[in-house]
Amino acid sequence: MSISARNQLKGKVVGLKKGVITAEVVLEIAGGNKITSIISLDSVEELGVKEGAELTAVIKSTDVMILA
């Protein structure tokens, strides 16, 4: 699949917490850094997300939130 987003980070799923509707996915990227995303449980199932899976996070610059 071809996408236009330039902010793509490859990594490994090191955490997965499933809720009733959504899931929290933790991806370890280069340098041991981690990013966390909340996605729908349907997406987790459709994409086959599981701990240890190699995935690519696609990040739109307009959808980034910074927490302190």
Curated annotation (Swiss-Prot):
Q: Kindly state a single biological-process term from the GO annotations of this entry.
A: molybdate ion transport
UniProt key word Transmembrane = no
- Which InterPro entries does UniProt cross-reference here? Mo/tungstate-bd_C_term_dom (IPR008995), Mop_domain (IPR004606), Transp-assoc_OB_typ1 (IPR005116)
The organism's superkingdom is given as Bacteria
Q: Which UniProt keywords apply?
A: Molybdenum
Where is each Mop domain found?
2-68
Coiled-coil boundaries = none
**Primary role:** Binds one mole of molybdenum per mole of protein and contains a pterin.
Cross-referenced NCBIfam families: Mop
Annotated protein name in UniProt: Molybdenum-pterin-binding protein 1
Recorded source organism is: Clostridium pasteurianum
Gene name as annotated: mopI
